[in-house]
């Protein structure tokens, strides 16, 4: 909530060190020598790194006038400097003594957010972002030289030095084990990451090297002055790294491929995080152990914190599974909030986030400082979080860009009543009972699209009557749904009959839905499929794509492959909520036959590549075809795949990659990337949309009454195309004589 606390490991007092509502204080870290606490704060109006004396409480601002978003910081093990990264895509080193800062690395691709120190504070390793593949770099502070550890052929992440500094451990995507699709002859690569070890010094033991048990004469190596000094002062040994032929020394840890991060190496043990918990791989025993908790290591690997759920406990460095039996007490982690101060801080940070993350440096020509002043005067009058969200929304709206949103943080959320729904429409009959006037068609094999009244054993039909719910007669009930309050997902008994009378009635058990939207959507799509099929004598297929996410991809796959045998195709992008899968869909629609294949006793050939649709295509769009639903018709037109019909699309394609929360859990969406034309002529689509080839708006009255003029036009156009653009698999040629 924007404050820095210290907690006793066992017993004592919890201290709120910053105790403010007008600043976002975050990312605190003790210095390894325990003298300082470094943290990031915007208490002076911009995010900077602050130092707090752990004993006196005195504070000083270490960095000055950054005007950027700081992602993270890490102390050098000698407590003399701090490494930190920020949104201008630089990795920086700041001296604690005087605040002097040097840029260690920069990137024209993205932030440098994965970095670590060697325990002697001499070396820094980090990920250098690349357009295709990232690389691991080691920076030597003594020589000021950078050394690339990887060859750019495989993606890498999470580099870290071993405790003794002789090894580098990292994650890399080098496991090639394709999974083949069940819908077409295609593949995907999942779970490519494994853990790798790179010996850095000439005297480093090579893990998993061949061994020989024959005894050897012991070698007496007299201790050097450096060794004696290290033993006497417990300093870390001074390592000199050998960079020759470095990429060929990489060794794979024999663990299964998966999602790994947060690597550490202490002696023969490699610690890694996978699926939430930390595990150990013992290089000597060649065994993997799940520690049953998430482990976070303290400075110098002297202590660690084990986390299980929301419980934390200080422990020694573990080598066996950990149980959090004596968690740190967090009961005193409390603060008093001045909401008006907090709302001003949230307003300020929201303005800065848009400044720091917005894709266009010119802020679309808007006087962004002037916009800040314009809306700032309203904040003292805000008395509810929803009002703040509205003001921030108006502020960022000055940029005239899509994907610029403001989301509520802490605000009242009334509990919703789980109303039971039956996938049907009803009318009060003169008898007092309820007549079923419409049953929404469903796919009962799918929980999301089941229609309760049509389930096996229920089989209520249109024109039937609902007489009672759970034994209570509906004769005096004004609204049938008043008896279904709180019944969603629960078993309900309906008394039904073909006539509005109790004689001959039967009781059936149903499970009402909590949401009918998927049922209505399924029904709408099926009606469109039938309409297109009936109007084209079964020759034309129909696909609706509701978004460009998982649901949209599923709808495309479900309806594209079964209709490959159709002679033409209508694709409906109307109401598409966006996402990111339009390249996958477009690639399939772009396929053209390279050749045809026949098998023994086949009467016709098959298209190669598989999944190729031969016939003409038409695309429907409207003003609700948004985001990637905008980009899809652009790709469709760019590749000349067919005619686009309907209304100009939404026109919002400046996208975003995640959000950064503000102190109360709210966020703003900052548009951070934008598409521009293939010929480099300028940015595309944003603020205008994609124009259809045939402009046609649905009349709202006709649409409400079931007439879809745009779909009717698509049918008309596709039938005309079939007269001139019809494509079919050619007949199998005569067999050769050899």
Features from the language model and the residues they span:
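Residue-level detector of Asp-centered blade-edge/turn motifs that repeat once per structural unit
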Residues: 32-33, 77-78, 119-120, 163-164, ...
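Multi-bladed beta-propeller domains
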Residues: 7-26, 31, 41-42, 52-71, ...
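PDZ/PDZ-like domain segments forming the peptide/carboxylate-binding groove
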Residues: 417-476, 550, 673
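Extended, small/polar residue-biased N-terminal targeting/export presequences
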Residues: 380-435, 502-528, 715-716, 720-737
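Structural motif
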Residues: 3-5, 46-50, 90-92, 133-137, ...
């Amino acid at each position: 909530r924007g404050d820095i606390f210290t907690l006793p490991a066992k017993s004592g007092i919890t201290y709120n060190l910053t105790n403010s509502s007008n600043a976002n204080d975050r990312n605190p870290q003790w210095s390894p020598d325990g003298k300082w606490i470094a943290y990031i704060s915007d208490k002076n109006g911009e995010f900077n790194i602050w130092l707090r004396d752990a004993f006196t409480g005195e504070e000083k601002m270490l960095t000055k006038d950054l005007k950027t978003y700081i992602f993270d910081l890490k102390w050098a093990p000698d407590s003399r400097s701090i490494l930190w990264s920020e949104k201008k895509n630089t990795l920086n080193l700041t001296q604690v003594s005087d605040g002097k800062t040097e840029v260690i690395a920069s990137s024209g691709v993205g932030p440098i957010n994965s970095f670590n120190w060697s325990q002697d504070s001499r070396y820094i390793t980090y990920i250098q972002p690349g357009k295709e593949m990232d690389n691991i770099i080691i920076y030597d502070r003594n020589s000021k030289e950078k050394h690339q550890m990887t060859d750019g052929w495989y993606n890498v992440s999470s580099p870290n030095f071993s405790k003794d500094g002789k090894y580098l451990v990292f994650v890399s995507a080098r496991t090639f084990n394709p999974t083949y699709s069940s819908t077409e002859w295609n593949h995907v690569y999942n779970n490519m990451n494994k853990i790798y070890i790179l010996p850095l010094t000439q005297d480093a033991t090579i893990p998993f090297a061949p061994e020989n048990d024959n005894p050897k004469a012991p070698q007496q190596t007299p201790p050097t002055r450096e060794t004696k000094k290290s033993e006497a002062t417990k300093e870390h040994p001074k390592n000199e790294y050998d960079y020759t032929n470095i990429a060929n020394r990489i060794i794979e840890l024999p663990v299964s491929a998966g999602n790994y991060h947060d690597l550490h190496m202490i002696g023969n043990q490699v610690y890694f995080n996978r699926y939430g918990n930390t595990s150990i791989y013992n290089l000597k025993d060649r065994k993997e152990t799940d520690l049953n908790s998430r482990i976070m290591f303290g400075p110098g690997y002297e202590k660690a914190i084990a986390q299980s759920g929301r419980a934390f406990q200080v422990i020694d460095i573990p080598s066996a599974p950990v149980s959090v039996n004596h968690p740190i007490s967090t009961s005193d982690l409390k603060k008093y909030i001045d909401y008006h101060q907090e709302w001003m801080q949230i307003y300020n940070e929201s303005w800065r986030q848009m400044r720091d993350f917005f894709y266009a440096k010119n802020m679309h020509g808007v006087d962004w400082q002037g916009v800040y002043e314009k809306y700032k005067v309203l904040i003292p009058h805000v008395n509810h979080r929803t009002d703040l969200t509205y003001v921030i929304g108006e502020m960022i709206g000055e940029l005239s860009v899509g994907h610029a949103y403001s989301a509520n943080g802490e605000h009242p959320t009334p509990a919703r009543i789980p109303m039971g729904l039956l996938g049907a429409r009803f009318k009060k009959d003169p008898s007092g009972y309820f007549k079923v006037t419409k049953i929404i068609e469903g796919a009962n094999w799918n929980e999301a699209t089941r229609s309760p009244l049509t389930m096996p054993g229920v089989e209520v039909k249109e024109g039937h009557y609902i007489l009672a719910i759970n034994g209570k007669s509906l004769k005096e009930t004004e609204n049938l749904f008043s008896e279904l309050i709180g019944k969603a997902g629960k078993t309900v008994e309906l008394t039904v009959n073909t006539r509005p009378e109790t004689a001959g009635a039967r009781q059936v058990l149903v499970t009402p839905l909590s949401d009918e939207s998927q049922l209505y959507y399924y029904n709408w799509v099926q009606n469109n499929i039938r309409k297109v099929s009936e109007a084209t004598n079964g020759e034309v297929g129909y696909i609706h794509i509701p978004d460009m996410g998982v649901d949209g991809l599923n709808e495309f796959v479900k309806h594209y492959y079964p209709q490959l045998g159709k002679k033409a195709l209508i694709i409906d992008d109307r109401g598409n909520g966006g996402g990111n899968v339009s390249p996958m869909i477009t690639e399939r629609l772009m396929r053209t036959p390279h050749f045809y294949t026949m098998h023994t006793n086949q009467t016709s050939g098959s298209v190669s590549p598989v999944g190729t649709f031969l016939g003409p295509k038409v695309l429907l769009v409207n003003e609700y075809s948004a985001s990637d639903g905008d980009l899809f018709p652009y790709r469709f037109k760019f590749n000349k795949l067919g005619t686009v019909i309907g209304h100009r699309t939404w026109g919002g394609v400046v996208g975003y990659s995640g959000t950064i929360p503000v102190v109360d859990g709210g966020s703003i969406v900052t548009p951070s990337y934008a598409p521009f034309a293939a010929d480099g002529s300028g940015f595309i689509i944003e603020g205008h949309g994609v124009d259809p080839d045939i402009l046609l708006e649905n009349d709202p009255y006709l649409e409400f009454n079931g007439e879809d003029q745009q779909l009717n036009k698509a049918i008309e156009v596709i039938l005309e195309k079939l007269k001139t653009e019809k494509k079919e698999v050619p007949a199998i040629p005569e067999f050769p004589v050899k």
